[in-house]
Amino acid sequence: MTGVTPVPVLHLINGEFYAGAERVQDLLALELPAQGFAVSFACLKEGVFATRRRCQDAPLHLLPMKSRVDLRLCLELARLVRAQNFRILHTHTPRSALVGRLVAALTGVPMVHHVHSPAERDTEQGWRNTRNALVEKFSLRGARRLITVSASLERMLREQGFTANRIRCIPNGVPVSECLRRSYQPGEELTVGMIALFRPRKGIEVLLQAMAQLQGAGARVRLHAVGPFETPEYQRSVLELTRRLGLESSVTWTGFRTDMGAEFRQMHLFALPSLYGEGMPMVVLEAMAAGLPVVSTLVEGIPEVVRDGRDGLLAQADDPTGLAAALLRFVRGEVDAAAMGDSGRQRQRDNFSDKSMASGVAAVYRELLPP
């Protein structure tokens, strides 16, 4: 949109991690300028987003909160919004939604909230989920528009009493990619890939148990696991399970990587054995864009993306035997992995691109701006 002054938008984010929701924020900052919007960030926590993001040209304000209700920060953000004439506030987490509601009330700038996953099913700690869900529900009352990344999350908001005229379902999207998968022939070792911020709800323990079952039955499989762990304690727990299952020589832990293409080239298929708390996993879309068949679970937004038997195979959550059975079909060549990968790649191009995501978000912004 050359010749048009871009509309300034402030995204309030946590900034602690660089995982799926942060990939959405990053891609929006890269793609929204083509739609006439200039993104800035305000990070409410110290973390890795500032250094790992691709959108290094987007201004970033590091304003860590001193407490969960930091009125000083809200006043500081309100001054920033007025000084830089931000026209939209876009929030992404329960924490940022609470701050955003207060800043919107102070400035009169409309707030948009992006629901990336169900707050009530985000961690294994029930009390924390309940607290975050209550904070989010209260905070969202101040949002003019609510963006959900999947139909399952849209239904959740409707069940909570939010009206349809405020909700817009905009699926996540990722850049299109060349086909990167490794070809597989039955009889060779099958490399299963998983990319995640490893935390309990991602189900890595279930995948390890499934691999142990497969190896016990004589199947040749290994795991290429990419990404950091949420905490050192959780990392120690997972590595100990790997040792107890006798899988130490069959698992590669790479840690965080920036070149996802290089990692996808190591994989024959992609697995995400999520237990709960998924809106629409970005990493599944990225795997599909790379032409990998996907083995995942029947959790919330995942079946909206992966069509069972066409783009991959879906198992019940928290079912190592069911997951092993799905993987075994690839080991034995009972499914056409290449055809599934090609199907998923075309589906991503047609329905889940970064450009279509940005176009949808821009349309929401325009609803809130004066003509």
Sequence positions of predicted segments:
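Short His-centered aromatic/hydrophobic patch
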Residues: 91-99, 115
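Active-site donor-binding acidic/aromatic loop of nucleotide-activated sugar
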Residues: 231-235, 248-257, 263, 313-314
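Short hydrophobic beta-strand element within catalytic cores of glycosyltransferases
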Residues: 42-43, 284, 293-296, 306
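Carbohydrate-associated surface elements
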Residues: 152, 173
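Conserved acidic donor-binding segment of nucleotide-sugar-dependent glycosyltransferases
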Residues: 308-309, 313-320, 329-335
